[in-house]
Amino acid sequence: MSSGGLLLLLGLLTLWEVLTPISSKDRPKFCELPADTGPCKAIFQAFYYHPVHRTCLKFIYGGCEGNANNFKTIDECKRTCAA
C-alpha cells in the first residue's frame, strides 16, 4: 500500500474513533446513577446522564452531596457519559 493510502486509512480510522459513541461497557458506572439533588436547598442548574433515554438532561442541584452523575454543563455530561 502506498504512503498516501496508509495516511488515508489512518485518517479514516481516527475519524471513526472520534465519531464512534461511548459503549455502555466503557461508560463510567456513575453515569447509571439517578439524578440526586442532595439535601441542601440551593438552586443550581446541573445536568445528569439518563441511561434509559441515553442523553443528558437538566435537573436542579441543591449544592451539596448528591452523586457523581452531576455536571455543570451539558457538554461535560455528553463527553463523560453520552453514547
From Swiss-Prot:
CDD domains: Kunitz_textilinin-like (cd22594)
InterPro entries associated with the record: Kunitz_BPTI (IPR002223), Kunitz_BPTI_sf (IPR036880), Prtase_inh_Kunz-CS (IPR020901), TFPI/VKTCI-like (IPR050098)
Cysteines paired by S-S bonds: C31-C81, C40-C64, C56-C77
Cleavable signal peptide: 1-24
Swiss-Prot/TrEMBL keywords: Disulfide bond, Protease inhibitor, Secreted, Serine protease inhibitor, Signal
Annotated coiled-coil segments of the chain: none
Tissue expression profile of the protein: Expressed by the venom gland.
Gene Ontology MF, one: serine-type endopeptidase inhibitor activity
Predominant location: secreted
Matches recorded under Gene3D superfamilies: Pancreatic trypsin inhibitor Kunitz domain
Disulfide bond as UniProt keyword: yes
Record-marked site positions (Reactive bond for trypsin): K41, A42
Subcellular location: Secreted
Boundaries of every BPTI/Kunitz inhibitor domain copy: 31-81
Pfam families reported in the protein's UniProt record: Kunitz_BPTI
UniProt superkingdom: Eukaryota
GO CC, alphabetical: extracellular space
Its job: Serine protease inhibitor.
Family that this chain belongs to: Belongs to the venom Kunitz-type family.
The protein's name in its UniProt record: Kunitz-type serine protease inhibitor superbin-2
Organism of this sequence: Austrelaps superbus
Native organism taxonomy: Eukaryota, Metazoa, Chordata, Craniata, Vertebrata
